[in-house]
C-alpha cells in the first residue's frame, strides 16, 4: 500500500531528525547528503524503466546512489560517532559502499534464480516493471535478438515473457 509506505517513511525520517538534533554538524551534513543521493538514485531507477537501454556504468551509478550510499553512510557515521579519525571513517564508508552494491547485485540475482518461498516476496517483478538490473542489461547486451523475439511472440503475456526471459538468463553464462 503506497500511501501507508509513504507515511511510514515520513515517520521514520522524522524520528531520524529527532535523534540527529544533538549530533555534530558533520553527521547532519552527511545524513542530509545521503537523503539527496538516495532520492537521486531512486529517480534514476524510475527513469530507467522507461528507457529501452541503459549502460552498465549508469546502472552501477544508480545502485551506488539508491542502495550503497546509505550503507556507506551508516558505516561511516558509526565510525565518526565512535571517535575514529577521518581515514578510518573513510575506510568504513568504502566498506559499506561495497556491501551495499553487493546487496543490490545479490537481490537482482535472487529475483531471477530463487523461488518465491525463498525470497518471501513476488519474483520477477523486475522484469514486469522493466527494471534495468545487472542481469537484464547483460541479457540485452548478449541476447538482443532473443529478447526482442520473446517480447514479440508473447503478445504482452507477462507470465510467459517472465518465464522465457528468466530461462534465457539462467541458461546463459550471465549468472556465472
Regions found by a protein language model. Give the residues of each.
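All-alpha prenyltransferase/terpene-synthase fold signal
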Residues: 1-176
Amino acid at each position: 500500500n503506497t500511501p501507508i509506505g509513504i507515511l511510514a517513511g515520513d515517520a521514520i525520517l522524522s524520528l531520524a531528525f529527532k535523534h540527529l538534533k544533538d549530533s555534530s554538524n558533520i553527521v547532519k551534513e552527511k545524513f542530509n547528503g545521503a537523503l539527496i543521493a538516495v532520492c537521486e538514485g531512486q529517480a534514476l531507477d524510475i527513469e530507467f524503466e522507461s528507457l529501452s537501454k541503459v549502460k552498465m556504468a549508469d546502472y552501477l551509478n544508480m545502485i551506488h546512489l539508491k542502495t550503497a550510499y546509505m550503507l556507506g553512510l551508516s558505516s561511516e557515521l558509526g565510525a565518526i560517532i565512535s571517535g575514529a579519525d577521518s581515514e578510518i571513517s573513510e575506510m568504513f564508508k568504502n566498506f559499506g559502499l561495497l556491501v551495499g552494491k553487493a546487496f543490490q547485485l545479490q537481490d537482482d540475482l535472487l529475483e531471477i534464480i530463487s523461488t518465491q518461498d525463498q525470497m518471501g516476496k513476488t519474483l520477477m517483478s523486475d522484469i514486469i516493471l522493466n527494471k534495468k538490473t545487472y542481469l537484464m542489461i547483460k541479457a540485452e547486451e548478449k541476447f538482443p535478438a532473443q529478447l526482442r523475439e520473446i517480447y514479440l511472440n508473447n503478445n504482452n503475456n507477462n507470465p510467459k515473457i517472465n518465464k522465457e526471459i528468466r530461462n534465457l538468463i539462467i541458461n546463459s553464462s550471465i549468472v556465472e
